[in-house]
Amino acid sequence: MSIVTKSIVNADAEARYLSPGELDRIKAFVTGGAARLRIAETLTGSRETIVKQAGDRLFQKRPDIVSPGGNAYGEEMTATCLRDMDYYLRLVTYGVVSGDVTPIEEIGLVGVREMYRSLGTPIEAVAQSVREMKEVASGLMSSDDAAEASAYFDFVIGAMS
């Protein structure tokens, strides 16, 4: 739920107008809209590069997962790992656009640790893959945009820790 919707729902529940503080938060949200869209466009337009480079970095740092017996061993399992990375990158873009972590949490993080545990997938490797995407993506943006996007990557990483 965006800051706009949250503010309206809260004010309406109390049968009142929006407060000056709520209006200020909405103004900041609207003012930052162009930056959030620019970040989302960068992430979306560069998704293949981000996932590929981050995957390469992950596999160099964690050769155990692409070695025989590893969860990303073999072409099919490596593709599955990269698919999952792409999914988390997409969730980050949802958070960036909405200016809120709620879509990330509600769409894709509920039960994620339990799911990976049941599959025998090392959750720390999944978290590392998101860290690698954050690093690659940050290199494609201005420092301000990278700082904004980092909060959403960090939220995903934190949910896996």
UniProtKB/Swiss-Prot annotation:
GO terms for cellular component: phycobilisome; plasma membrane-derived thylakoid membrane. It is a peripheral membrane protein. It holds the Pfam family Phycobilisome. Contains one covalently linked phycocyanobilin chromophore. Its main location: membrane. It is found in: Cellular thylakoid membrane. GO terms for biological process: photosynthesis. (2R,3E)-phycocyanobilin binds at residue 81. The modification N4-methylasparagine is found at residue 71. Keywords: Antenna complex, Bile pigment, Chromophore, Electron transport, Membrane, Methylation, Photosynthesis, Phycobilisome, Thylakoid, Transport. The keyword Electron transport applies. It comes from the Bacteria. Light-harvesting photosynthetic bile pigment-protein from the phycobiliprotein complex. Allophycocyanin has a maximum absorption at approximately 650 nanometers. Heterodimer of an alpha and a beta chain. Belongs to the phycobiliprotein family. This is Allophycocyanin alpha chain. The gene is apcA.
